[in-house]
């Protein structure tokens, strides 16, 4: 095709003859300089030039070629859009590529990607957005091509660099979790952080090396190991460590570095979030549980209200049957249902008085504001923070576990109930919620309920978990668990007898007799049933009821409210006493496919997929004091099992895996419907129907569509700001964040999953740019003024008064003015460093405080407010001043004499 449209680009006359077949053939080629393949290859359109080069996503050899040869026109072989380097704009050619290839022409109806006030500039310029690439069937097709067995990716070993088998086994197990690995391989634009030691970049490099096509025999994970040691000193040195503790430390740090703000829906009628600085309830259970901060990771993006369950939930099962016809109890049932459903909004810890007539109002912050006629209904809000990595072995791990709570009937599995008064002052600083690929893949929710058997008051706790630490039941415990399946009352009360429903009396008796001769046969289902079993709180473990104000007998159970995409199960094989440690060597049999979690779900759970297949398992050989870690992993490409023993990678049979002494297991949701959906979308891509609109979709969500059993609603918020534009800080690499798909594919995905918002036009948000400039100006002014005032304070020899300020608040303010934190710190809070003595507020001894001048205090207080004022006097007092004057007077008198 020669010539061309009525375009004002004078360089179109230089276009040579080119056919549709030639463009298609070039699109399957590679860059002539760096040999990288597509997509995003650019072909030179100069007459007689056949050059094909890579774009900005690689070395941008197409631009280099244009600069060296002065060939101005180039065409993107993926989108077939034409760019003129001389005119610095997109131009259009009149071409006839056939009816099935009209997708590129449809781009004519779509405005080029540009800012609202300017044309598209030269690719790569700071003020422009490079046109994102169009998606192909390869971008969404999960059908892996058949590879040569000797060249299968993902079979690279890890070198042991000094007792690091615990790390190598954990890394190989994580590496074979497709949702996480594909994120680091395909969503590189999101792997950015300014936090040290940038562990996410080291992990991304490691994953790239492990799954490279030209794989090496092994990789040395030095950079990642150095980063872990910088995060947690426990891993320094060359002593053997716990593999599960390493996993928690690694995933916590990855979450911190990759977390992004969850956009808050604008709701003018939202309830005011309550203060979340709770006092601890006086429970008889030990305070040894901390939940992870990933409550902020709730990624429900649909706009529908909470689903009303058809069946009653587990909390209702605890109530006396004779009261179910009572009108007050019916109101309370509705309240408890709402409290259960609040789990999708965050981690909550609530006490419900079963005689109150309260109605919960769920705020956008995940808190619940109760309105009722009774004053003894209290709501508990969990103060949930992601735990720091453990500093010891199993004994400490149980206290820092992100697993759900249990009572002391199973060791080291108790909950902490924290409460606040009904109405508390509102916090000025917004409590932001965050999510990351870690929280999206591994976070689930547990609902735990405790009922007082005297007043029927129910305490409901919703907490997020990242892994579940399961006890290994002994012989007597197994007998109780198996026999409970034949006691209907216990099943109704919330026990997990459903897990053993198919077992009859004869099978139970035979298995029980067999266990006396050959030892108990423990299954993973037994461990789960033991964890979720109902517990009676009595004797030394009575429940402290807030309504009765006494220790009462109670009943406690927990269920799963929402299931994670990948379920991480930790078997508690190690017991650490004061003087010695032991290891439980009991073999726990586990399924390779079809782990069913349905018996452990809450009745009103919205989980659609409850079946899991095994991905990988970490095993420990040896004793509690010494041993060796290996991992068995299923390769996603050929579905075969391999043993990863440091540098050695060996194919093994399924029976070998099932006989392993499992320590940590990774299970992934299994859903055949998702595979069918992917194939359907692939066929829609291949149809290449003409469309007038092109849609931009988040690469991160497309990765979830490819690897998750339940990808959830479409979410484009990872590349959009609250105003619907591109945040200025993401404009430079927008091509790494989005993919352009045709209208027919978007229509199908949107009708199937919902979500959004729909995006047909990309532009840099000027509103965000103005806000950033204002914020930077404020930061600079505050920082400069503080430096000047503090310098004057340092030069002052004897200040009359010195003001104290909480270092906790000061660090938050410092993070804000240095650009590390987005939001201002809120009002000054000196309550933790102040103590009231005889009506006077003074500095608390040993308080974490700093000293500033009166001028500095007034400056900060005028901007942020808060208090109280805490001052200290300098050591030179008025008394000492009077004494010095007396001495001078005596000296004068002496001289006179």
From Swiss-Prot:
Major place of residence: cytoplasm
The domain of life for this entry's organism is: Eukaryota
Molecular function via GO: cysteine-type deubiquitinase activity; cysteine-type endopeptidase activity; zinc ion binding
Q: Which BP terms in the Gene Ontology apply to this protein?
A: axon guidance; cell migration; centrosome duplication; endocytosis; nervous system development; protein deubiquitination; protein K48-linked deubiquitination; protein K63-linked deubiquitination
Q: Which residues form the active site?
A: 165, 628
Chain intervals for the UniProt region annotation (Disordered)? 261-308, 343-420, 875-897
Which SUPFAM superfamilies is this protein grouped with?
Answer: Cysteine proteinases, DUSP-like, RING/U-box
Domain USP, first and last residues per copy: 156-670
Q: Residue spans with biased composition (Basic and acidic residues)?
A: 299-308, 344-353, 886-897
Q: Where is the composition biased (Polar residues)?
A: 287-297, 355-396
List residues binding Zn(2+) 3.
Answer: 44, 49, 65, 71
Instruction: Fetch the InterPro entries from UniProt.
Output: DUSP-like_sf, Papain-like_cys_pep_sf, Pept_C19_DUSP, Peptidase_C19_UCH, Ub_carboxyl-term_hydrolase, USP_CS, USP_dom, Znf_RING/FYVE/PHD
Similarity-based family: Belongs to the peptidase C19 family. USP20/USP33 subfamily.
User: Protein name, please?
Assistant: Ubiquitin carboxyl-terminal hydrolase 33
Q: Which gene encodes it?
A: usp33
């Amino acid at each position: 095709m020669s010539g061309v449209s009525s375009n004002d680009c004078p360089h179109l006359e230089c276009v040579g003859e080119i056919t549709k077949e030639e463009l298609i053939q070039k699109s399957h080629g590679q860059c002539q300089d760096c040999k990288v393949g597509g997509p995003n290859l650019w072909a030179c359109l100069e007459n007689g030039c056949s050059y094909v080069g890579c774009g900005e996503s690689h070395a941008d050899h197409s631009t280099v070629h244009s600069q060296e040869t002065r060939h101005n026109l180039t065409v993107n072989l993926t989108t077939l859009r034409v760019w003129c380097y001389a005119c610095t704009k997109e131009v259009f050619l009149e071409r006839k590529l056939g009816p099935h290839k009209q997708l590129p022409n449809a781009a004519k109806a779509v405005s080029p990607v540009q800012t609202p006030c300017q044309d598209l500039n030269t690719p790569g310029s700071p003020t422009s957005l490079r046109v994102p690439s169009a998606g192909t069937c390869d971008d969404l097709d999960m059908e892996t091509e058949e590879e040569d067995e000797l060249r299968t990716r993902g079979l690279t070993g890890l070198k042991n660099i000094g007792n690091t088998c615990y790390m190598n086994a954990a890394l190989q197990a994580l590496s074979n979790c497709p949702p996480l690995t594909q994120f680091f391989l395909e969503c590189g634009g999101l792997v950015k952080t300014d936090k040290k030691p940038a562990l996410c970049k080291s992990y991304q490099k490691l994953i790239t090396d492990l799954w490279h096509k030209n794989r090496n025999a092994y990789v040395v994970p030095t950079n990642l190991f150095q980063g872990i040691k910088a995060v947690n000193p426990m891993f320094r040195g060359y002593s053997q460590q716990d593999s599960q503790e390493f996993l928690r430390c690694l995933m916590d740090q990855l979450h911190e570095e990759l977390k992004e703000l969850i956009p808050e829906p604008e709701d003018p009628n939202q309830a005011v979030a309550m203060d979340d600085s709770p006092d601890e309830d006086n429970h008889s259970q030990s305070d040894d549980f901390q939940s992870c901060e990933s409550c902020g990771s709730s990624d429900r993006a649909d706009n529908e209200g909470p689903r009303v369950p058809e069946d009653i939930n587990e909390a209702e099962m605890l109530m006396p049957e004779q009261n179910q016809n009572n009108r007050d109890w019916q109101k309370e049932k509705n309240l408890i249902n709402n409290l259960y459903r609040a789990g999708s909004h965050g981690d909550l810890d609530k006490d419900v008085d079963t005689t109150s007539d309260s109605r919960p109002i769920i705020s956008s912050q995940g808190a619940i504001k109760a309105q009722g006629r009774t004053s003894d209904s209290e709501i508990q809000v969990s103060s949930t923070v992601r735990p720091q990595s453990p500093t010891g072995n199993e004994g400490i791990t149980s206290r820092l576990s992100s697993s759900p709570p249990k009572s002391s009937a199973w060791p080291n599995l108790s909950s902490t109930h924290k409460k606040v008064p009904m109405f508390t002052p509102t916090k000025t600083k917004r409590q932001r919620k965050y999510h990351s690929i870690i929280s999206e893949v591994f976070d689930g929710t547990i609902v735990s309920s405790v009922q007082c058997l005297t007043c029927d008051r129910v305490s409901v706790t919703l907490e997020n978990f990242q892994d579940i630490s399961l006890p290994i039941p002994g012989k007597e415990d197994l007998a109780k668990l198996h026999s409970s399946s034949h006691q209907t009352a216990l099943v109704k009360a919330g026990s997990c007898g459903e897990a053993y429903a198919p077992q009859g009396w004869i099978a139970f008796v035979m298995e029980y007799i067999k266990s006396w001769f050959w030892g108990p046969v423990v299954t993973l289902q037994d461990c789960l049933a033991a964890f979720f079993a109902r517990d009676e709180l009595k004797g030394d473990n009575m429940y402290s009821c807030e309504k009765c104000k006494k220790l009462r007998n109670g009943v406690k159970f927990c269920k799963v409210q929402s299931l994670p995409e990948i379920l991480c199960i930790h078997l508690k094989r190690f017991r650490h006493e004061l003087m010695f440690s032991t290891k439980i060597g009991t073999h726990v049999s586990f399924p390779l496919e079809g782990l069913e979690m349905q018996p452990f779900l809450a009745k009103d759970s919205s989980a659609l997929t409850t079946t899991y297949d095994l991905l990988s398992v970490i095993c420990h050989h040896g004793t509690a004091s010494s041993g060796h870690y290996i991992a068995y992993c299923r390769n996603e490409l050929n579905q075969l099992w391999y043993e990863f023993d440091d540098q050695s990678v060996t194919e093994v049979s399924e029976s070998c895996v099932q006989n392993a002494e499992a320590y940590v297991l990774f299970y992934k949701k299994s859903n055949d419907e998702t595979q069918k959906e992917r194939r359907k979308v692939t066929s829609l891509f291949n149809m290449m129907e003409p469309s007038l609109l092109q849609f931009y979709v988040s690469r991160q969500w497309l990765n979830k569509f490819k690897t998750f059993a339940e990808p959830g609603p479409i979410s484009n918020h990872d590349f959009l700001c609250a105003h619907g534009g591109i945040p200025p800080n993401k404009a430079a690499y927008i091509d790494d964040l989005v993919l352009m798909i045709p209208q027919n594919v978007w229509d199908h995905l949107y009708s199937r999953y919902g979500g959004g918002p729909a995006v047909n036009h990309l532009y840099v948000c000027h509103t965000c740019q103005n806000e950033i400039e204002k914020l930077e100006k404020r930061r600079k002014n505050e920082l400069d003024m503080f430096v000047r005032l503090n310098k004057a304070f340092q030069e002052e020899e004897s200040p009359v008064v010195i003001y104290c300020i909480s270092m906790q608040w000061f660090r938050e303010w410092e993070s804000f003015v240095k650009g590390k934190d987005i939001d201002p710190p809120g009002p000054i809070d000196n309550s933790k460093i102040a103590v009231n003595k005889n009506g006077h507020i003074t500095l608390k001894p040993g308080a974490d405080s700093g000293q500033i001048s009166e001028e500095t205090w007034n400056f900060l207080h005028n901007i942020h407010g808060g208090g109280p004022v805490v001052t200290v006097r300098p050591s030179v007092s008025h008394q000492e001043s009077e004494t010095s004057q007396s001495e001078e007077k005596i000296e004068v008198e002496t001289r006179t004499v």
